[in-house]
């Protein structure tokens, strides 16, 4: 039976996958893909069929079991393969997940480059994207406070192009030679291997204080950017400065950006902490779930461009990876769109073995003298050799879709068989020739831009690299009030975990006082550092667009792909339940039924003799409010049961404390009011009135609900007057931060 079910599921999956056209890369991978659900007999790795894989060959008789025999080559192979399944994990970005998709160019930038992927709007370029955390090991949690990796591999007709980016546009260091020291400092401390996947320890904060260049970056790391709600709701940045070269040989400096269609949203810190234990796979499951439900994540692809002749026109060095190019100075130009639409078939050979290199560029794109990029170009290629071997680019997930032919040979795990008698250039057959400089340009070989270089060989950076505070101030000034509040709390949490007074006293009392005095004073008071009396550097007061996440709310409110919990017990109101569930699905969101049990639950007026009931997706003890974007409780007699359950009340309180939308109808309105009214004057709908009331993101409607109150198709508007419209609008805003700013959330125990 299990085999039949598995086979049926697999066939259904195949049908779904075959309904859409496959990209060149997916077709390429098919030759290395095997079906694990087939009835084909089990074999050894050398192709011999296996008759028994459950018992080791041994000496036995009727009375006892004797010794196992070493001659059992099948058992030995099975154990040998198991013993060698693991490979070295990535030193950084070890914890990650990935998906396939497509990149579509919307606007040709032929004025800037001759790269086909950025000039040919008829192309649909296959991509593989890997999201990751930076600090933790493969087994760490998804929701830690950390930078997120956002690496994109384009399988272009001219070769693979990798944008090895992050969800934060700057980095901690300017020069790649400091990378080993930085990673040593951010990783668990060497004497006890503690803490895992956290910056909240002495060594990290010691390092960043002693490296003022890290100031801008750690401001980002203490912001909400470091605890994203979803990989689908975070920006991506190329971090480094690259160059674009056009057919005329003119060079422009460029930075790459990814902007999510769903907006840029984050968890709250208490929620992130709890999810680390409740669902450590939260982000990877969220991505897979969205793709499985055809809520395909999308990002706009944008560039910032500076002509070569204007390189020196800014107060900062445009090659400094610890600096952004403010958008009011260098506007974004949106030119394409990325969509992720297929999950991996097997994690290890695809997500774990995928390898990205900043040195993977295609003709029309070039490197710059960005000192961090220069070192990354060496390090990334080198680390792939360590992890995967010298022939790592022959692995299915890494190989290009365009022809590959050269004179490279041999090495461990070489796959390709090359015919012919020569393996060098030049050769008497003129076989496999380089294109030469005449072949550069569109469709030709890679040609390095002929950059003029002059200077003195020494170990130094130019003068503009020495300024480290202006953009840190710019970032903090640009935050909204709730974002600033979250940053104060983040610094206070992190430095509270530092037990060396030298570390937290100078960071709070000195470095932060160079950014913002009020921030420094608040953090110093919380962590027990001397409170600075004056700013150590005058704040310039400038702000910049698109640094605050509040500027990325979608223009048209949407709840697409949002996870909404509906809590029910025996005796729930079927009208409100069915009406809202239907409306949620119609809005492309995901309803999850949370029951008092995961067995049949009956609506008001039903029992097992008159109805099959509803089987919930989960029971309340198997999930937590942290795993959902909003919660709805319909009315009905079941509320009497819910009222007696402390965990349900905690669910309500936690939803409120985490600033999420909370909806209730009928008898459930009083349950919500009772739960939250300990210290609050909760404003809810009258128990007899169906007119909806919205109060700090809590949407209620009293009385018995009528079917016409729940429209299947709802236009989500700020001024909606119906219950569903009001509730959906609150969900679309992600969180009700005014609830926090007015001090309401802090009065609730959660």
Swiss-Prot record:
Its main location: other. GO terms for biological process: hydrogen peroxide catabolic process; response to oxidative stress. CDD domains: GATase1_catalase. Disulfide bonds: none annotated. The keyword Heme applies. One of its GO terms (cellular component) is peroxisomal matrix. InterPro entries: Catalase, Catalase_AS, Catalase_clade2, Catalase_clade2_helical, Catalase_core, Catalase_haem_BS, Catalase_immune_responsive, Catalase_large_C. Residues 30-49 are annotated as: Disordered. SUPFAM superfamilies: Class I glutamine amidotransferase-like, Heme-dependent catalase-like. Heme binds at residue 380. Coiled coil: none annotated. It is found in: Peroxisome matrix. The active site is at residues 93, 166. It is an enzyme of class 1 (oxidoreductase). Its cofactor is heme. The keyword Membrane does not apply. It catalyses: 2 H2O2 = O2 + 2 H2O. Keywords: Heme, Hydrogen peroxide, Iron, Metal-binding, Oxidoreductase, Peroxidase, Peroxisome. Its EC number is 1.11.1.6. GO terms for molecular function: catalase activity; heme binding; metal ion binding. PANTHER family: CATALASE (PTHR42821), CATALASE-B (PTHR42821:SF1). Catalyzes the degradation of hydrogen peroxide (H(2)O(2)) generated by peroxisomal oxidases to water and oxygen, thereby protecting cells from the toxic effects of hydrogen peroxide. Belongs to the catalase family. This is Catalase A. It comes from Aspergillus fumigatus (strain ATCC MYA-4609 / CBS 101355 / FGSC A1100 / Af293) (Neosartorya fumigata).
């Amino acid at each position: 039976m299990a085999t039949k079910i598995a086979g049926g599921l697999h066939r259904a999956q195949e049908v779904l996958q075959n309904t859409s056209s496959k990209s060149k890369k997916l077709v390429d991978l098919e030759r290395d893909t095997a079906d694990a659900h087939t009835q084909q007999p089990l074999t050894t790795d050398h192709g011999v069929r296996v008759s028994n894989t459950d018992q080791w060959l041994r000496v036995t008789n009727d009375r006892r079991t004797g010794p196992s025999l070493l001659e059992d080559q099948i058992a030995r192979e099975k154990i040998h393969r198991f013993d060698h399944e693991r490979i070295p994990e990535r030193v950084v970005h070890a914890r990650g997940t990935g998906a396939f998709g497509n990149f579509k160019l919307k606007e040709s930038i032929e004025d800037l480059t001759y790269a086909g992927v950025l000039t040919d709007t008829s192309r649909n370029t296959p991509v593989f994207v890997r999201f990751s955390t930076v600090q933790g090991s493969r087994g760490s949690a998804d929701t830690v406070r950390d930078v997120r990796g956002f690496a994109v591999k384009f399988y272009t007709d001219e070769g693979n192009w990798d944008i090895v980016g992050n969800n934060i546009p700057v980095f901690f260091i300017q020069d790649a030679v400091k990378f080993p020291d930085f990673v040593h400092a951010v990783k668990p401390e060497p004497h006890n291997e503690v803490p895992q996947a956290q910056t909240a320890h002495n060594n990290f904060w010691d390092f960043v204080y002693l490296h003022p260049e890290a100031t801008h970056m750690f401001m980002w790391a203490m912001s909400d950017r470091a605890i994203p709600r979803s990989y689908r709701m975070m920006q991506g940045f190329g971090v480094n400065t690259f160059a674009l070269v056009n057919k005329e040989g003119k060079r422009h400096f460029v930075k790459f950006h990814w902007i999510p269609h769903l907006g840029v949203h984050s968890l709250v810190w208490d929620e992130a902490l709890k999810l680390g234990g409740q669902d450590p796979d939260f982000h990877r499951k969220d991505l897979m779930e969205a793709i499985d439900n055809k809520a395909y994540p999308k990002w706009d692809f944008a560039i910032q461009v500076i002509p070569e002749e204007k390189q020196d026109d800014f107060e900062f060095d445009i090659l400094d990876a610890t600096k952004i190019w403010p958008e009011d100075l260098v506007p974004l130009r949106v030119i394409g769109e990325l969509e992720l639409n297929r999950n991996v078939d097997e994690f290890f050979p695809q997500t774990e073995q995928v390898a990205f290199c900043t040195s993977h560029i295609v003709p029309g794109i070039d490197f710059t003298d960005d000192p961090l990029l220069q070192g990354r170009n060496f390090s990334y290629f080198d680390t792939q050799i360590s992890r995967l071997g010298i022939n790592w680019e022959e692995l299915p997930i890494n190989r290009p879709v365009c022809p590959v032919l050269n004179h490279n040979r041999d090495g461990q795990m070489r796959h390709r068989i090359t015919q012919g008698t020569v393996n060098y250039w030049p050769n008497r057959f003129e076989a496999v020739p380089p294109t030469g400089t005449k072949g550069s340009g569109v469709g030709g070989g890679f040609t390095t831009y002929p950059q003029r270089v002059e200077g003195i060989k020494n170990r130094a950076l130019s003068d503009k690299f020495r300024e480290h505070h202006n953009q840190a101030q710019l970032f903090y000034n640009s935050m909204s009030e709730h974002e600033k509040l979250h940053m104060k709390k983040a610094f206070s949490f992190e430095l509270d975990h530092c037990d060396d007074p030298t570390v937290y006293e100078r960071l709070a009392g000195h470095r932060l006082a160079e950014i913002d005095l009020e921030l420094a004073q608040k953090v110093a008071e919380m962590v027990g550092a001397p409170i600075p009396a004056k700013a150590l550097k005058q704040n310039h007061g400038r702000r910049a667009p698109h640094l605050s996440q509040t500027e990325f709310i979608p223009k048209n409110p949407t709840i697409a792909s949002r996870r909404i919990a509906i809590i029910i017990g025996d005796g729930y109101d079927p009208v409100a339940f069915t009406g809202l569930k239907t409306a949620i699905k119609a809005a492309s969101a995901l309803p999850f039924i949370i029951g008092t049990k995961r067995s049949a639950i009956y609506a008001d007026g039903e029992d097992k003799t008159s109805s099959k009931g509803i089987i919930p997706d989960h029971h309340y003890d198997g999930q937590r409010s942290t795993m959902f974007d909003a919660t709805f409780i319909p009315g009905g007699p079941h509320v009497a049961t819910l009222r007696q359950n402390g965990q349900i009340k905690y669910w309500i309180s936690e939803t409120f404390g985490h600033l999420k939308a909370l909806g209730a109808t009928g008898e459930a309105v009083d349950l919500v009011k009772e739960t939250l009214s300990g210290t609050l004057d909760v404003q809810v709908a009258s128990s007899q009135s169906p007119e909806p009331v919205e109060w700090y993101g809590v949407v209620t409607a009293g009385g018995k609900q009528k079917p016409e109150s729940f429209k299947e198709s709802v236009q989500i508007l700020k001024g909606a007057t119906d219950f569903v419209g009001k509730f959906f609008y609150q969900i679309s805003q992600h969180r009700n931060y005014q609830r926090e700013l007015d001090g309401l959330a802090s009065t609730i125990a959660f």
